[in-house]
From Swiss-Prot:
Gene3D superfamilies: Glycogen Phosphorylase B. This is UDP-glucuronosyltransferase 2B31. Glycans are attached at residue 316. Its main location: membrane. InterPro entries: UDP-glycosyltransferase, UDP_glucos_trans, UDP_glycos_trans_CS. The chain crosses the membrane at residues 495-515. It comes from Canis lupus familiaris. The keyword Cytoplasm does not apply. It catalyses: glucuronate acceptor + UDP-alpha-D-glucuronate = acceptor beta-D-glucuronoside + UDP + H(+). GO terms for cellular component: endoplasmic reticulum membrane. Belongs to the UDP-glycosyltransferase family.
Length: 530
């Protein structure tokens, strides 16, 4: 390690030593791709504040690079599969989700989605086993005396590690399908009458039939669709802990849930004390662009530029789709910077340049940027919100369609279908977003909402992590609803009791009235006889 990094580490340790003694040790159970990019922002800030951060990463990890110089520590464990196999699995999954999924059939689509989820979580369970069944590694983790586990719910295991190490747990997440984890483990109340289910692509302004559709989604996700094979995970967790338990039971013990959105994105809905929004925590003011890129941007003149990226997971696409897109881009007066790593499209215009990587945040913050063509990933959308840039959304998979629906409902985006859009569709969408001032105005309004917060999202995320470490948990924020059964939560037992009381009162009153009537009738007959 260079002297520079040794000095940095010594400085951090000394700052912690001379501070109030509140520096802690954080164990991280990470996820790949955009999830890692988001969490790493939090980790860098924790390290900057003097905390010791250790990331549990497998030898198969795709983005987590332990060899890169960093003040973050990495604990590498041997995985059952190679990095190449893990990456190939994701590429295969992406190709199926983007090109082969029958999106016009609800039942077929979600049935296949469940199959893919189960295959993914089968790999995830093996990674978890590689850690918790490794006695040497677990002994080392226990001896390290960590203060907290920071985990992403998309790959379970963080809650099991927290239970085994007997330390608090903080979650960082965007969503779970159907809000299953948030509702059943976090206890978050999400009334289907006005809160659209994630992946339903509905807004909070629902017609009667849309509310019917939303209720069907709720019932489907609650009683039919299983994101993960719960029985398998319940059995695995029970075997490891040596007592009967469930995945949801352990997840329910999470102290804080950090949701990677905010009210600039979300529709209004109830929130609980141990849930908080940290959307856009990775966003920052734009830096200067590389010289060559800045010259190209400046050459756009008054027309400005368009930024185009389909995210970190999609570096390629079919030639046919690439040519459709390139043809549309060639017809606009703006210069285009396109993140693309495939064969150069035949229809590529002189106004478009291809890059294997783009400084996306810096480009979106450039004064000449007019529009952002995005797949709808949460990180990219938040960079557009942060800088007030209107969007053309081309969602590919997962929550991306839902994200674009949110932006469309707020008047800051137009949505297109990747599989069916023509060059004319993309061209018209770009012209609309660039030339209709309402899109820019709405994007700037969202930007204003995002910036008008008492605490910055990153500071809020770090605050809650430090808060949990200071108080050895945050169980005082946990609502009592966690300890109630479903019928107690909905007061069905109380309603049943009250109905029984009313029924009993009616029955007794009726019987008394009948008795009195009979008495009066008998008395009347006696009087007549006399």
């Amino acid at each position: 390690m260079s002297m520079k990094w040794i000095s940095v580490l010594l400085g951090l340790q000394l700052s912690c030593y001379f501070s109030s003694g509140s520096c802690g040790k954080v164990l991280v159970w990470p996820t790949e791709y955009s999830h890692w990019i988001n969490v790493k922002t939090i980790l860098d800030e924790l390290v900057q504040r003097g905390h010791e951060v250790t990331v549990l990463t497998s030898s198969a990890s795709i983005l987590v690079d332990p060899n890169k110089l960093s003040a973050i520590k990495f604990e590498i464990y041997s995985a059952h599969l190679s990095r190449g196999d893990f990456e190939a699995f994701f590429i295969k999954l992406l190709n199926i989700l983007i090109y082969d999924m029958p999106k016009d059939s609800f039942w077929t689509y979600f049935s296949l989605m469940q199959e893919f989820f189960w295959e993914f979580y089968e790999c995830a369970q093996k990674l978890c086993k590689d850690v918790v069944l490794n006695k040497k590694l677990m002994t080392k983790l226990q001896e390290s005396k960590f203060d907290l586990v920071l985990a992403d719910t998309i790959i379970p295991c963080g809650e099991l590690l927290a239970e085994l190490l007997k330390i608090p747990l903080v979650y960082s997440l965007r969503f779970s399908p159907g809000y299953a984890f948030e509702k059943h483990s976090g206890g978050l109340p999400l009334p289907p009458s006005y809160v659209p289910v994630i992946l339903s692509e509905l807004t909070d302004q629902m017609t009667f039939m849309e509310r019917v559709k939303n209720m069907l989604y709720v019932l489907y996700f609650d009683f039919w669709f299983q994101t993960i094979n719960e029985k398998s995970w319940d059995q695995f967790y029970s075997e490891v802990l040596g007592r009967p338990t469930t995945l949801y039971e352990l997840m329910r013990k999470a102290d804080i849930w950090l949701i990677r959105t905010y009210w600039d994105f979300e529709y209004p809905h109830p929130l609980l004390p141990h849930f908080d929004f940290v959307g856009g925590l990775h966003c920052k003011p734009a830096k200067s662009l590389p010289t060559e890129m800045e010259e190209f941007v400046q050459s756009s003149g008054e027309n400005g530029i368009v930024v185009f990226s389909l995210g970190s997971m999609v570096n390629n696409m079919t030639e046919e789709r690439a040519n459709v897109i390139a043809s549309a881009l060639a017809q606009i007066p703006q210069k285009v910077l396109w993140r693309f790593d495939g064969k150069k499209p035949d229809t590529l215009g002189p106004n478009t340049r291809l890059y294997k990587w783009l400084p996306q945040n810096d480009l979106l913050g450039h004064p000449k940027t007019k529009a952002f063509i995005t797949h709808g990933g949460t990180n990219g959308i938040y960079e557009a919100i942060y800088h007030g840039i209107p969007m053309v959304g081309i969602p590919l998979f997962a929550d991306q369609a839902d994200n674009i629906v949110h932006m469309k409902a707020k008047g800051a985006a137009i949505r297109l279908d990747f599989s069916t859009m023509s060059s004319a569709d993309l061209l018209n969408a770009l012209r609309m977003v660039i030339n209709d001032p309402s899109y820019k105005e709405n994007a700037m309004k969202l930007s204003g909402i995002h910036h008008d917060q008492p605490i910055k999202p990153l500071d809020r995320a770090v605050f809650w992590i430090e808060y949990v470490m200071r108080h050895q948990g945050a169980k005082h924020l946990r609502p009592a609803s966690h300890d109630l059964t479903w019928f107690q939560y909905h007061s069905l037992d109380v309603i049943g009791f009250l109905l029984a009381c009313v029924a009993t009162a009616i029955f007794v009153t009726t019987q008394c009235c009948l008795f009195c009537c009979r008495k009066v009738a008998k008395t009347g007959k006696k009087i007549k006889k006399e």
